[in-house]
Structure formats: C-alpha cells, structure tokens
Amino acid sequence: MSNTETASAFSHEIHDPSDAEWINDEAGLARVIERVLLEPAYAIDTEFLRERTYFPRLALVQIAWPTGLVLIDPIAVDLAPFRRVLESDVIAVFHAADQDLEVLEYACGTVPRRLFDTQLAAGFVGFSTPSLSTLAERIMRVKLSKGDRLTDWTQRPLTTAQKSYAASDVIYLLAMRAEIEAQLESAGRSAWVEEESELLRTRARGQSYADKAWWRLKDGRVLRGRDRIVAQELCAWRERRAQQDDKPVRFVLPDLAVLSVAQAKPTTFAELAATRGVDGRYLKSGAGNEIIQAIERAADLPAAALQLPEPEDFDKRLRPALTLVSAWVSQLARDAKIDASLLATRSDLISFLRGDADARLARGWRGTLMGDAVRQLVSGEAALAFARDGSLNLEHRSNQPLRVEVAVPTADWVLDAPDPNAA
C-alpha cells in the first residue's frame, strides 16, 4: 500500500520519506523551530551512536508535522536552540522515547515538557512493547523497511536510502497517535497514559546514580557479604571514571574484572595486576591506584551502605501471596488488554505487599484500578478460583465474583491483535 493510499484512510497526511528536507545550518534550524511552534504536536526521532563513548553522540534528528518533514544534521548545526520547542506546549510524539529523551537532554539540556509515546500508549490498548514496524502494520496497514541497523549515522554524506529510512521513523507517528488516542478515550484510559508519560518524562536517565551502578553488573548476584560492598564501590568508581573520560564502562574496567577484584580484594598494585580479568589497559592514568582506594573505602563501609536492587528483607511468609497476586495481575491484564508490565512489575508487587508508603499500586491509576482488590486478596477477604476456561476469577469468600470494572478498547486493530501477555 502506498503512502497516499494509506493517508486516505486517516486524518493525518502521510509524507513520502524521500521528500524530507535536509537541515544543516542555523537559518534552516531557526525556520523549523518557528514552524513547529505553530503546531499542536510534532513527531520526532533521533539517531545516535555510543559504542565507544559514555555519552550518546547525536547524529540525526527526524521531525515531522502535518505539512513538513525534515532531517536535522546536529553534526553541522548546534541543536541547542531546539530547546525552545522542547520547553513549549507543543506535544512531542515519539515511539519508544526513553533513549531519545536521554539524547535530547544531553544535546539540549532538557526533555520535552509534553510528550506522547506510541509504544507506551499502545500498551494500554492491547500491545506489549510493540516495535514501530508492528504498530505501523497493525494500525496503518503498511510494512516498514527494516533498513540497515548497522548504519553509522555519523558518516557524511548519508545516502538517499539512509535518509528515507530515517524519515520513515516519523511519518506515521502523528496518525498512529490519533488512532491510539481515540481508543484510549473510548476506554477511559487517557489519564492513565498521561500519568505514565509524566513518569517517563521525569525519570532519571543518562548519568546513572553511581551507588546503584552495580545493579547492572553481570552475575553480580553471585556475590555475598563484603564482596558485594566492594563491587558496589568499584562500580560507583567505574561509573564516575567512565563519565569523566567519556568512555563505556566496559572500557574502564570489564564486569569480569570487577567480580574478580571484589572477591580477591587485592591490597597492592602487583596483586591487582595479577587478578583475573585485569590487565595493563585498565590500570593506566592512575586508574590502578583509584581501584585500590575504592577497595579500601569499601572495607570501612557498614553493611547497611549496600544499595540493593530489590528488598531482600521481604517477608518470606508473603512469598505465596506474591505468587498469587502475580497470577491475578496477569489475568487482569489479559482481560483488560493491558500490557502486564504496565500494571505491575515484580518490584511493584513486593513494594505493595511490604506496605511501602510510595508503592505504585497504592496510588494513581493503578491504585484506583486494582489496589483494593489486591488488599482483599492478601488479607484473605477474597480468593482466586479457576474457571472452566482456565482463567482466574477473583471472588469474595462468600463465593460471589469480585469484579474489577474496566472498559476495553474496541478498534479492530486492537481486538485482532495477539494477546500481549501470552506466554
């Protein structure tokens, strides 16, 4: 199906990706900024590289609005003035926005004041973190080219095919947003998406909290006791050094070396150099001495200084309740056509069962939808029962069904979609 044929079925015109205008000077960028500021919303995507750097290197910005389609070259022109658009009331429409937000924050010093993420929103109407191509095929009835995923977007000039591929990432977003929003409105879920979008917008990203960097340490869970505290201190040092040198953390000290050093706890430079996974590349420019100092700092830290990715003092007596509630949440997600990971993660359930004051299930749209039901299930006022079709029903102890009322999206592209929570 051509772009023109697709456009006839939707209120938003679909641009031909080959018509994208190349913007590589201040005058062109200023013109784009003034034009986008007149719109209620614009579609945006970014291309970047970070294979050999800590911070993302922005290589291309794709922007579309109903009457315009541009590719901005941030290598040739400073993107900082685009901050005016980001700080305005014009809604930025992304697909899978998280990394784009990090890139824009690094390049412009801020993120959009208002945003809509088609991937996030689609999770509320029957999809599970869908790719852009999946949504385009389901909603727009078009197949996107997979393109060359290994493209070095920093190289110039880009080919015509590369430009068209990049532009195709934004040409459908405004139309898809309109379709998804209609379903959200009909199901009464628009406010839910607004709430989640604000959480996405304000989430800490980019420069990780150094004391929590060890959460990403591969096989870090095998460590125990003092070894864990050493690993935490090493990863915190590694994160700060990576930021300072603008290098990936693996270039500063690989995970294997962190694990080995945490267990061996060398006290001299010679012992450190002989530790598995450590070689001279990682000990230059004072790094070796800094590693020894990190080990020494860890020796003086109390056990309470350890930052845990998940509460380990979770009452073991509540573990059966965790399993039970998880099963019911999965059933509710299937019934309501919501991505189960949006309803509640394992950490969300643990936080709620522990009675944490800031538990996500106790507030916002989650609390309204299922907070009371989970409380009744855990307290024993309600129970789960198997139905003949294999589904789970939540019932009062009086054997009366306890229903969670929730409207369901009705569009064909939603109803025909595969179960987002199927195994």
Where are these regions (language model features)?
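Accessory DNA-binding and partner-docking regions appended to nucleic-acid-acting proteins
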Residues: 160, 170, 176, 180-423
